[in-house]
A protein has these predicted regions:
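Hydrophobic transmembrane alpha-helices and immediately adjacent juxtamembrane helices
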Residues: 1-233
Length: 235
């Protein structure tokens, strides 16, 4: 209760960052809707984007803190992704009689991109809850924590792409000019990562049972994607 009172002391009455709304949510009081809700949300997104030095540094610190005493650091995720891709690629290429030289790079890239999607959804469901203390102490736009999350997932995505580059060097699949679509597609991934993380973050902050439900659904959804069922792409 004292934390909430302290928060109220640092949140101005004309706050446009949404910090006051989240403080009320943590206190258990549902935020009151008003005619400026969308304007305040847009203002928060803009102000959060302008605080790029803050969320870039926080995202980088998240990775350093998580793997502080690890020899390989975040590359453990890269290794795990590579092993998973190799196992799934070999298994499903045999089951579905797919060409391994095409299917294995396909599964590898799919797993890497799915890791980004799943990270934005699952971590997004916890983005405000996990940063509750920082939100109460730091008078910054709430979107800073969302940008921080997406930036962190982008860093994971970047070094996981090493696996795919290795697959390209080994199997040399024909990509053609369509391969250039990766860059606009990546931009769409980043934009969608922001709103998805913010959406699930808001819902999970109000309804705490949403986060574990989201975790289960994300794991289930993986097996419903064209990453594994390559035959769907040929239809």
């Amino acid at each position: 209760m004292h934390n909430v009172e302290r928060t109220a002391g640092v949140v101005p009455e004309n706050d446009h960052t949404g910090l006051g709304l989240l403080a009320k949510t943590f206190e258990g009081e549902p935020p009151k809707s008003d005619s400026f809700t969308y304007k305040r949300a847009f203002t928060d997104l803009v102000e959060g984007w302008k605080s790029d030095q803050l969320w870039l540094q926080l995202g980088w610190q998240d990775i350093k803190q998580r793997y502080r005493r690890s020899t390989l650091g975040p590359f453990w995720i890269t290794i795990a992704t590579g092993v998973m891709a190799l196992a799934l690629g070999l298994l499903y290429s045999l089951l579905f009689q797919e060409d391994l030289s095409f299917f294995l790079p396909h599964v590898t890239l799919g797993l890497i991109l799915w890791g980004f999607i799943a990270g934005c959804i699952q971590d997004g469901a916890q983005v405000f809850i996990a940063n509750e203390g920082l939100i109460k102490q730091l008078p910054a736009p709430l979107s800073v924590h969302v940008y921080r999350l997406v930036w962190r997932q982008t860093l994971f995505l970047a070094h996981n792409m090493i696996i795919y580059l290795i697959m390209l060097a080994i199997f040399r699949p024909h990509l053609g000019w369509a391969g250039l679509l990766f860059f606009p597609a990546l931009l769409l991934f980043l934009l969608n990562g922001v709103w998805v993380a913010m959406f699930f973050g808001i819902i999970s902050t109000r309804f705490r049972d949403v986060a574990p439900l989201v975790d289960s659904l994300v794991q289930l959804c993986f097996y419903m994607t064209p990453i594994v069922w390559l035959s769907l792409i040929h239809i």
